[in-house]
Amino acid sequence: MISKVLESILLDRLGKYINTRDNQFGFKPKHGTELCIYSLKEIVEMYRGQHSSVLIGVIDASKAFDRVNHQKLFTKLNQRGVPASIIRILAYWYANQSMQVRWGSSVSGPFSVANGVRQGGLLSPALFNLYMNDLSDQLNDCRTGCMIGNTVINHLMYADDLAILSPSSAGFQQLLNVCTEYGVRHDVQYNSNKSSVIICRAKGDKDLHFPQFYLSGEKLCVCYKVKYLGHFITDKMSDDDDILRQCRTLYAQANMLARKFHMCSDHVKICLFRAYCTPLYTAPLWGKFKKSSMHRLQVAYNDCFRILLKIPRWSSASELFVNAGVNTLQALWRNLMYRFIGCG
C-alpha cells in the first residue's frame, strides 16, 4: 500500500516530463486499443481507396516490460529534465527491490531483479512508454510511410505492441531496420516467429511481387490475417474473422457462466450476461463483413442468453430480451458504435 502511494505521488510529479508521441496509444487518457486499431484500418482503407497497396508489420517484442534496462531508463529520465531527487528515489527503489516466487505452498528465497519495470506498478506503464518513445522518434525521422494530410504515419504503438506501415517495400524494410537497431541498443528482443507481415493489396497490385522482409536478421512470415491487440486484421480488411472470434468468445463465456453460476437466480444470471457477454470487443470497428457472419453472431448471442437461463432454443429471442430488459444484438451494436464515436 505504501509503495502505491509513493508511486502515485511520483507519477503526479513526473507527468509533465514523460509525455510521449501521439503514435503511442497505451495508458493514455481518451486512448485505447479500439482507437489504435481504428486508426490502422482507416489508414489502410484510405490508401486502398487510392489504388495503393499497404504493408503492415505486426512486431512482437519478447517480454518487453521485463527487459527494460534500468540504467538506460534513468538516463532517459535525466535527458527529459526530471529532477535528480526523483531519479535517485527510483534508482534506489529498483536497485534494492527483491522478489519471491510462490508455487502452491512453496515459496522461493528472495532474489534481486536487474531489469524490467515493476509488475502492477502505477508508474510502470508511463516508464515503459518513455523507454520506447525514442523508437517512435526514430521511426518518425525516417520520413517514409503513409501520408495523411501533411503528416507521415509509419507506426502505431500500444505499450509494447507495435505495428509499422508503409506503401513501399523499401520503406517498409527501412522501418524494420530501425526497429532492429533500436532493439540491439536497448535490450529489446523481437520474436520473429510471432511477428508477421500483411500485404493489403490494391486491385491493380494482385500479381505484384514483394520481396522478403527481415527483422533482426530473421525472415518474417507473410500472412493473410494477424491478430493485433486482440482483433483480427486480414489482407482484404474484412471483419468476418473477427466476428467469428467474437462468436467463439460468447459461447465460451456463456458456458463458463452456466457452469459456475447454475444455482443463482435469473436476476443474477442476467447481470452476469450483461457484464461478460455484452462488451463485444471491437464491435464498433466492424464495417466490412458478410451477412452470414453477422447472422452467426446473432445466433450465438441469442443462444448464449438461452444457455444461461436454461431456455429452449425455439423460444422467441426478441421476447426473451424484452422481458429481461437486455438489449438485442442490433441495439447493443448501435449503442457501442455511438459510444465509440462519442455520442453515447
Predicted regions and their residues:
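Amphipathic alpha-helical segments in well-ordered regions
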Residues: 1, 5, 9, 13, ...
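Conserved pre-catalytic core of RNA-dependent polymerases
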Residues: 1-130
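Mobile genetic element proteins and their domesticated derivatives, centered on retroelements
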Residues: 6, 10, 14, 40, ...
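Active-site palm subdomain of RNA-directed nucleic acid polymerases
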Residues: 10-24, 127-159, 163-165
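Short, flexible turn/loop "capping" segments at secondary-structure junctions
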Residues: 49-51, 154-157, 224-225
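Catalytic palm subdomain of template-directed nucleic-acid polymerases
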Residues: 64-80, 155-185, 201-204, 235-238
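Short, conserved micro-motifs composed of acidic
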Residues: 105, 189-224
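Non-catalytic, peripheral interaction segments enriched in hydrophobic/basic residues
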Residues: 159-160, 191-196, 200-202, 225-344
